[in-house]
Amino acid sequence: MVSWMICRLVVLVFGMLCPAYASYKAVKTKNIREYVRWMMYWIVFALFMAAEIITDIFISWFPFYYEIKMAFVLWLLSPYTKGASLLYRKFVHPSLSRHEKEIDAYIVQAKERSYETVLSFGKRGLNIAASAAVQAATKSQGALAGRLRSFSMQDLRAIPDAPAPAYHDPLYLEDQVPHQRPPIGYRAGGLQDSDTEDECWSDTEAVPRAPARPREKPLIRSQSLRVVKRKPPVREGTSRSLKVRTRKKTVPSDMDS
């Protein structure tokens, strides 16, 4: 893991950033020699990046694989070894010059076929989307028609013909409260100066209810335990004879002196 991180850092800094800045300096100074040198480097480095994708998949387990890759990048970039120029002159340029016409023909065919393939794939995609939309629409219409057919006339007649519920506005509740209907036989005009109560009631008269008896207060516990003694009734026409007790005074006898 550590070797992989170091390898990626070396490839990024010494394989891309430094050559990119050197190419900028060559274009700015219009030095043809440096310009050709860095063009050869970028061609070789592009081939290296293409081969790296395959080698990372199959031979990344090889011992010292990342160390070898770092050394190869430094060898390509070094001005002393001039590895990029050497590989280009020995291998890349001769092979490209031999197969240049074939490569150009393949590129032209790829452009034409790519345009045709894009159009064909676009048409197929539109056809598939249109057929899917039509199938979805037909399925939904069939389900709706089956749902409507399931309702028979008896089911429709069985629906109660109830009136719509009245809406009560909370701001005007007093106007919407229904007034009490007068009792049967009562004249709508009410009592007047010349009318009496018997005239206001045409046929029947309300029977007055007996006044409710007041509920007796419950006895307190102390009162309920008391025994009320009642005096016997006094009969009329009788009188008691009152005996008057007289005290006899003892007269002291005169003592003979």
Curated annotation (Swiss-Prot):
Compartment(s): Endoplasmic reticulum membrane
Gene Ontology CC annotations of this record: cytoplasmic microtubule; endoplasmic reticulum; endoplasmic reticulum membrane; endoplasmic reticulum tubular network
Membrane topology type: Multi-pass membrane protein
Modified residues (Phosphoserine): 152, 194, 202, 253
Matches recorded under InterPro entries: TB2_DP1_HVA22
Any matching Pfam family: TB2_DP1_HVA22
Primary localization class, coarse: endoplasmic reticulum
Keyword Magnesium carried by entry: no
Superkingdom of origin: Eukaryota
Sequence positions bearing Phosphothreonine: 196, 250
Keyword terms: Cell cycle, Cell division, Endoplasmic reticulum, Membrane, Microtubule, Mitosis, Phosphoprotein, Transmembrane, Transmembrane helix
TM helices/strands, residue ranges: 1-21, 42-62
UniProt GO BP: cell division; endoplasmic reticulum tubular network organization; mitotic nuclear membrane reassembly; nuclear envelope organization
Renumbered residue ranges of the record's region Disordered: 178-257
General function of this protein: Microtubule-binding protein required to ensure proper cell division and nuclear envelope reassembly by sequestering the endoplasmic reticulum away from chromosomes during mitosis. Probably acts by clearing the endoplasmic reticulum membrane from metaphase chromosomes.
Similarity comment: Belongs to the DP1 family.
PANTHER family according to UniProt: HVA22-LIKE PROTEINS, RECEPTOR EXPRESSION-ENHANCING PROTEIN 4
Protein name per its UniProtKB record: Receptor expression-enhancing protein 4
